[in-house]
Amino acid sequence: MTEIYVDADACPVKDEAVKVAERHGLTVHIVSNSGMRPTGHPLVKQVVVPAGPDVADDWIAERAGPQDIVITGDIPLAARALEKGAAALGHDGRPFTQDSIGMALAMRDLMRELRETGQSKGGGPAFSKEDRSRFLRSLEDTVQAIRRRPPP
């Protein structure tokens, strides 16, 4: 059965993930290293992991499998999800794929280096309504695609 794992710290689309999951009766694991407001929703499993680098990522990566979806803005976590056969979506709905993850990791490293050397100061553009809409469409499409393929 497909499950959705949300890397919830700084995730702007938690509610949208729950909305799509509810439509399909899927469990959503909202994983964070800080407290969250309880939802009381029967399909939502709120997981609070200890503080520390990559603890939430590790929790997700250890559990996600080939029929699952990982929602994250963390490119290394997306790479780990893909290695396990899971689908991975960014907050803006853009899918991470085997074909794109290498370039995404390289760009992440380049941008970090540019920030460290002072050659780049800002982040990306602000999260927009279009990003939210793209995310909803992409998550729906991903759920449908997983449901159409045979189980591993």
Curated annotation (Swiss-Prot):
Disulfide bonds: none
Annotated segments matching region Disordered: 114-152
Extent of Basic and acidic residues compositional bias: 128-140
Family: Belongs to the UPF0178 family.
The protein, known as: UPF0178 protein Plav_1521
